[in-house]
Amino acid sequence: MNTANNTLPTAADWAGEDAAPDAADTRKIERESHKLEKRLCREVGRAITDFNMIEEGDKIMVCMSGGKDSYTLLDILRKLQKRAPVKFDIVAVNLDQKQPGFPEHVLPDYFKSIGVQYHIENQDTYSVVKRVVPEGKTTCSLCSRLRRAILYKVADDLGCTKLALGHHRDDIVATLMLNMFYGGRMKGMPPKLVSDDGKHVVIRPLCYVPEKDTARWAQYQQFPIIPCNLCGSQDGLQRVAVNEMLREWDKKFPGRIESMLRAMGHVVTTHLMDPHLHDFKNAKATGIADPNGDMAFDHEEFPVAPALPGLQVVQLG
């Protein structure tokens, strides 16, 4: 054992027979971490390719909140940057909205430690929101509008060509559900969009990544997470309910959320009810067979969902 100069024992000092279980656990964690890193890089790379998110010479502004998702986004983009087929720059940006208790040092310290270019924008939107929104009402909507306008201006000032947000697969599916349940429309979060002013391109490179993977990666990397409830306001009860529903679905029916995400990319407009997407009024029989047409009276066939591990289906009678 290394006890010179009264130093504490190192990991090597404990690498005897008694330490074997801990060493095995460490190797297992390292293997799982490596597999997760490869999966994250693969899924983010697939999203970038599928939707042409990043192009030669882009300057990507990664919007950092201090949560697990934005940390994961920044980390994976930096890993991909080293081996990407195109050259692009990254700048990490945090909007400090002057919420009471916000740890101002955490993000700058982290950015410096990893050597990434960064910018902290200080804007007291917290006071504005508290002054305008009545007590007891949710502040999220106004806060997000103010934040969006400020971030667009920062992107212009920094010469950024794209803004990258940390919304993941579960966020996208939850937004679709919220709009269907409470808004009466089929609308989610697009993986790539042009802002309403026509000047900015927003990308969501984590669109294929499940939340459980960003949570696990944040745990492995020990990111200095900043809590999201400093302002005292939370997402509405509707989003809370939908997120809980999706979590339960993921436990009981593995693959359902992934299937819903795939459905968002395979929309059959002729089989919905939006007259702006299909001319139902003028639909008439032509007498010409259409191999892709509808067999109106046929029963739709779906693949059998995989059974949960450890469960056996027993037929009675």
Swiss-Prot record:
Top-level EC class as recorded in UniProt: transferase
Gene Ontology CC, one term: cytoplasm
UniProt-listed Enzyme Commission number(s): 2.8.1.-
Cofactor(s) annotated in UniProt: Mg(2+); [4Fe-4S] cluster
Molecular function as annotated in GO: 4 iron, 4 sulfur cluster binding; ATP binding; magnesium ion binding; sulfurtransferase activity; tRNA binding
Presence of the UniProt keyword Hydrolase in the record: no
Subcellular location: Cytoplasm
SUPFAM superfamilies: Adenine nucleotide alpha hydrolases-like
Gene3D superfamilies assigned to the protein according to its UniProt record, in alphabetical order: HUPs (3.40.50.620)
Pfam family for this entry, one: ATP_bind_3
CDD domains: TtcA-like (cd24138)
Protein's name in the database: tRNA-cytidine(32) 2-sulfurtransferase
Species annotation: Acidovorax sp. (strain JS42)
